[in-house]
Structure formats: structure tokens, C-alpha cells
């Protein structure tokens, strides 16, 4: 069996680039908060940045070519009369943005913006947020060892149901891209041997050869010997993202990391990594790879070494104290709240469920006849092993089928949802977090969790784009 996690040739910006402006948050964040992305664009200005080579999902499909022609101010920047926004990216059609991304990628590769920072190795990541210090190791996974079909018991598995309709637009972005930037975070169930790791503090270069012998807490062990590694970057992250440092894991240390994860793979019972963040991004990478295999353009030998066979990801330890599972809330807009709540109550009864006053699911809204915020919460008392989010999402999906004007978005953070309820006069639905210790057993038993069940940290604690790798020949 080949290893599913491997070293990579990793690209980073050259030493003259402002790393704080280079690194922006995952494209699937703040999808209802245009002000966030406007502020990012203003802050980055003309500096080299990952903002120029990713497609924030808030803009995906929001403007047609005809709208662009009508709203353009003549300088390639859209004037939005209602919001007063004037941003370059808000004015682009999807096709224009994708073409811009691909062109900018090629420019960064040829003008010296990017350099190979790590050869056949990994990057140890130290991310400091309000939740603490979260560690990770960036490397390549073999997409042949991953599938988003819950029936496939692969080494790398999705944690939530994949919405197939979300994949084609993302394939269009990736299929002609020269490079990839990961915001995918995979989780490994690797209990930490704290006593052994604490004994490694102040380790020397010679201690690196012991990595392969580590049976518990591989990432934490590498972090304990970080002073023996070459530092790659050390920067604050914009928009309250905290601080990040990266270290090159090369040579013998990289070989030992590969062996340590290979040993973990051989003893994991067929399930090594669970997708913590970026389920749909990884599903897109898988789809692109399958399309390449089906294209007939490459021989079997060429496919074995094709760069698109792999995806650059960050591996994090499920047992890290700084890795917190947060709930993902729902926001309904253009909704008749009274009608929706009646529908919800009727469905609860129809399913033979019972509810009492509680906090498992909390609805927050502004009544049409008032300005004050109202909220009501319930617990579902006889749900058995079903999660509240599973019951809720099933009912919402059914409601949306017959109420085409109602829109749903998925929101990270209590304060963000409170603000959006006031701003949109919609209905916010607050959920509780799940116990992360149950994740692997739940996926192993049931396939996937309901979509948008949990989030790793708050929105500003998500992965910021930093490292890159080539995916096209």
C-alpha cells in the first residue's frame, strides 16, 4: 500500500513580499458579509496577495456580463448605488474573475513573486488564535485515497454530505489553474503522549531522527523540535486572524515524518484522515483529478506522477486543545418567520418527535410588527442518536423546496449572526457544537454528518492561504 500523505515541493512568496497582505482567509468564509471582503481588497490594494488567485464565494455567480456592462464606472470597478461599494472584484463576472486568477497565477510563477521554499518536504504550521496555539503539517495527499461518496470506505473521508451542485462552478475555477492554495484541513485521531513530547523541548538536530518512532502526537513532536527547523515565515494575519509561523521540515526530518504517518496509516483500520474544513474544495480537487484520468490524454505511467493526483492540505490533530469545534448557524432571508416556524413545528410532530423549551435549536428574528429581537429555543427530547442539526437541516431542505424565494446561508459565530438578523430582518437559527471526540466513530459508523454540522474554530480562526503547489504539467 502506498502512502496517502507525502512530502511536497512547496511554493511561498519571495522574501520581499509583505506576508500579512499575502495571506487571506479561506474563500468560503464571510459569504454574507461583503464589508469583510471589501476591507480585505482595500487593505491589499496592489500588493501581491492570495486574494488575487482565489475566488471568494461571496462573489460567485453574483453578477452577469450584462449587469457588469450596465454598472461599470468605466475603470473596471463597479459602482453599487445602493451600498456605495466600489470594488474591482465585486464587478467581475465569474468568467472574468477566473481568467484573472489564471493569468495572475502565471504572472506570479514567472515574475519571481513565488519561489520554491521547500523541496520534497513539509511545512510545520504554528497558528495562534484566541483558542490557543493550533499546530499543523502541510503536505500532499493522494486523491486516489479519498472519496466524498460516503459508501466508499477510503483512508481519507468527507465529514459532511457533499452538495453535488456546488462542485461544477468550483471545477471551472480549478481545472485550468496552474497552482493550488489549500484551505483544506484534515484531522487525524492521534492521542498526544505529552510526557514524551515535553521531554523533547530543546532537542538538537540529531533528535529529528526519532520522529518515525513516535506513536502518539506526531505533529506535536515535530513542533517540540522546531528550533532545529528553518523558519519560513512569521507574520500577523489580517482582519483579526491572529499570528502564524511556518517551519521547513526537510531532509531526514521529512523522511521521518513520512514514515511516522505511514505507520499510523498501517494501524488506523482503514480510516486515517477526516476532512475538518474544505469538504467541497477537496471534492472539487477529486472531481478534477477523475476528469483528467478519464480524458485519455495521459498514459498510466504519466498519471502516476501527474501533479493533479495530489492535493496540498494541512493535517491537524483532533486532540489539540486549540482545535475547537464550533457550531455553524443558519440564516434564512426573504422568509415569513411565522410560516416557517409553523412548518417546523408541524414537521416535528409528523416525525413523531417531541420538543420542549431549551437551547439545542434557537430561532432569532424580528417580528414584522416590531423592532425588538425575539428568540425561542427548543430541545428535541426523543431524537435518539440523531443530531439536532440533522433534524433541522432535513426540515429546512423540505421547506426550501416549496419556498423558492427563501435563501439560506451558513454563518460562523454568534455575534455575526446576531448582526445579520438585525441587518437582513431574517431568521437566525443558532445551534450547539458537537463533541469532537465522537467524530471518527460517527463517520466510521454512519458515513457522513449532516452538512455544515461543525466548524473548526470561529470564522477568523479558519485557515489563511499561504503555501502553494503546482497542479498542472
Regions found by a protein language model. Name each.
Residues 171-176, 265, 272, 301-302:
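A generic local secondary-structure boundary/capping motif
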Residues 253-296:
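Active-site beta-strand/loop microenvironment that shapes enzyme catalytic pockets
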Residues 288-289, 324-348, 352, 357, ...:
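Non-transmembrane, aqueous-exposed alpha-helical and coiled segments at domain scale
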Residues 390-470:
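Charged substrate- and nucleic-acid-binding regions of tRNA-handling and nucleotidyl-transfer enzymes
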Amino acid at each position: 500500500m502506498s502512502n496517502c500523505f507525502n512530502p511536497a515541493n512547496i511554493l511561498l512568496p519571495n522574501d520581499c513580499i509583505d506576508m500579512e497582505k499575502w495571506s487571506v482567509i479561506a474563500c468560503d468564509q464571510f459569504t454574507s458579509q461583503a464589508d469583510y471582503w471589501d476591507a480585505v481588497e482595500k487593505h491589499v490594494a496592489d500588493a501581491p496577495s492570495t486574494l488575487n488567485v482565489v475566488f471568494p464565494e461571496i462573489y460567485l455567480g453574483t453578477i452577469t456580463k450584462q449587469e457588469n456592462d450596465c454598472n461599470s464606472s468605466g475603470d473596471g470597478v463597479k459602482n453599487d448605488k445602493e451600498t456605495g461599494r466600489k470594488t474591482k472584484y465585486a464587478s467581475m463576472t465569474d468568467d472574468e474573475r477566473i481568467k484573472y486568477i489564471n493569468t495572475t497565477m502565471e504572472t506570479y510563477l514567472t515574475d519571481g513573486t513565488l519561489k520554491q521554499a521547500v523541496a520534497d518536504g513539509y511545512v510545520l504550521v504554528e497558528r495562534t488564535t484566541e483558542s490557543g496555539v493550533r499546530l499543523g503539517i502541510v503536505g500532499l495527499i493522494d486523491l486516489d485515497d479519498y472519496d466524498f461518496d460516503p459508501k466508499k470506505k477510503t483512508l481519507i473521508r468527507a465529514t459532511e454530505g457533499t452538495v453535488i451542485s456546488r462542485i461544477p462552478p468550483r471545477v471551472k475555477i480549478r481545472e485550468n489553474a496552474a497552482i493550488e492554495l489549500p484551505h483544506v484541513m484534515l484531522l487525524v485521531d492521534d492521542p498526544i503522549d505529552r510526557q514524551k513530547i515535553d521531554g523533547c523541548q530543546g532537542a538538537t538536530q540529531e533528535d529529528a531522527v526519532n520522529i518515525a518512532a513516535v506513536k502518539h502526537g506526531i505533529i506535536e513532536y515535530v513542533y517540540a523540535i522546531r528550533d532545529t527547523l528553518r523558519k519560513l515565515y512569521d507574520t500577523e494575519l489580517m482582519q483579526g486572524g491572529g499570528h502564524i509561523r511556518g517551519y521547513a521540515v526537510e531532509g531526514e526530518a521529512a523522511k521521518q515524518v513520512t514514515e511516522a504517518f505511514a505507520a499510523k496509516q498501517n494501524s488506523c483500520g482503514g480510516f486515517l484522515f477526516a476532512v475538518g474544513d474544505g469538504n467541497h474544495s477537496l471534492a472539487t480537487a477529486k472531481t478534477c483529478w477523475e476528469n483528467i484520468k478519464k480524458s485519455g490524454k495521459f498514459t498510466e505511467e504519466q498519471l502516476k506522477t501527474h501533479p493533479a493526483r495530489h492535493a496540498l492540505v494541512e493535517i491537524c490533530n483532533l486532540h489539540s486543545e486549540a482545535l475547537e469545534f464550533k457550531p455553524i448557524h443558519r440564516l434564512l432571508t426573504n422568509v415569513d418567520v411565522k410560516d416557517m416556524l409553523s412548518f417546523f413545528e408541524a414537521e416535528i410532530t409528523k416525525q413523531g418527535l417531541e420538543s420542549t423549551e431549551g437551547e439545542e435549536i434557537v430561532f432569532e428574528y424580528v417580528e414584522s410588527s416590531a423592532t425588538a429581537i425575539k428568540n425561542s429555543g427548543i430541545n428535541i427530547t426523543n431524537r435518539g442518536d440523531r443530531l439536532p442539526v440533522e433534524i433541522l437541516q432535513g426540515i429546512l431542505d423540505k421547506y426550501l423546496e416549496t419556498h423558492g424565494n427563501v435563501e439560506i446561508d451558513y454563518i460562523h459565530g454568534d455575534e455575526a449572526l446576531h448582526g445579520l438578523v438585525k441587518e437582513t430582518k431574517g431568521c437566525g437559527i443558532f445551534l450547539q457544537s458537537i463533541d469532537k471526540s465522537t467524530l471518527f466513530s460517527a463517520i466510521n459508523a454512519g458515513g457522513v454528518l449532516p452538512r455544515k454540522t461543525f466548524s473548526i474554530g470561529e470564522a477568523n480562526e479558519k485557515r489563511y492561504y499561504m503555501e502553494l503547489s503546482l497542479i498542472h504539467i
